[in-house]
Structure formats: C-alpha cells, structure tokens
C-alpha cells in the first residue's frame, strides 16, 4: 500500500537547500505560479514553498495557497521524479479559487515529470 504522508524528509528546510534549486532550475510555470525543479540524489522528491507578502497580502490567502500546494504534492509524491521543487507564487495567485489552483498545480507537476524524462 502506498503511503501518502508528508514527513520532514520531503521538505526543503534550509536556505542552502533552496539555493541549490535556484542555481540551475528546470522551470515550469503559469502567469500565477512557477515551479522550479532540480534533480537530487536522494531517490525521492522534496518541496519548498515561497509565497511573498508582496504578492499575496493576506495571511489567510498565503496559508490557503501553501496548504493546497502541499496537498497537491503529497498526493503526487510517488509519481514525481527525485527532484527538489520550489513553488514560487506570483501576483494574481490569490485570485485563483481552490479548483483553479489545484488544476494549475497538476498541470505543472505533469510538465516536470515530462522534463525529467528528457527528450
């Protein structure tokens, strides 16, 4: 049976882990959200989130975006390649409802799976 937990080892926690992804990322994005990814040697994917107060003013909106993103990652973690992902929220992401945000994330996860497989 597949475990769908979200333990600590599936998260990017330190600034150096985020910097690793920002140095040479593969990008997949929409006007409201971008997911940066970089292959890791751990054998499983990890995720980090950046939702700036400058782009999403209200705390409850930032929390909603982070919660939906974590849930999307948690459900797809076994389909994703062994990469470190950083999800960057841009202006306008707060205007998306839950369904639109979930659909955008699913599309970006699929795109990263294709990018990881190569040409």
UniProtKB/Swiss-Prot annotation:
Gene3D superfamilies documented for this protein: 3.30.230.10
Q: What is its EC number?
A: 3.1.26.5
According to UniProt, the reaction catalysed is: Endonucleolytic cleavage of RNA, removing 5'-extranucleotides from tRNA precursor
List all membrane-crossing ranges. Answer: none
By sequence similarity, the record places it as follows:
Belongs to the RnpA family.
Q: What's this protein's function?
A: RNaseP catalyzes the removal of the 5'-leader sequence from pre-tRNA to produce the mature 5'-terminus. It can also cleave other RNA substrates such as 4.5S RNA. The protein component plays an auxiliary but essential role in vivo by binding to the 5'-leader sequence and broadening the substrate specificity of the ribozyme.
Describe its partners and assembly state.
Consists of a catalytic RNA component (M1 or rnpB) and a protein subunit.
Q: What is this protein called?
A: Ribonuclease P protein component
| Species per Swiss-Prot/TrEMBL record | Escherichia coli O6:H1 (strain CFT073 / ATCC 700928 / UPEC)
């Amino acid at each position: 049976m597949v475990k769908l937990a979200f333990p600590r080892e599936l998260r990017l926690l330190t600034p150096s882990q985020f910097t690793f992804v920002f140095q040479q990322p593969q990008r997949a994005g929409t006007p409201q959200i971008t997911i940066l990814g970089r292959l890791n040697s751990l054998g499983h994917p990890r995720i980090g989130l950046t939702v700036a107060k400058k782009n999403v003013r209200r705390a409850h909106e930032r929390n909603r975006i982070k919660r939906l993103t974590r849930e999307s990652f948690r459900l797809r973690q076994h389909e994703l390649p062994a990469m470190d992902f950083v999800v960057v929220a841009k202006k306008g992401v707060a205007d998306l409802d839950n369904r639109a945000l979930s659909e955008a994330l699913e599309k970006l996860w699929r795109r990263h799976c294709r990018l990881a497989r190569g040409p």
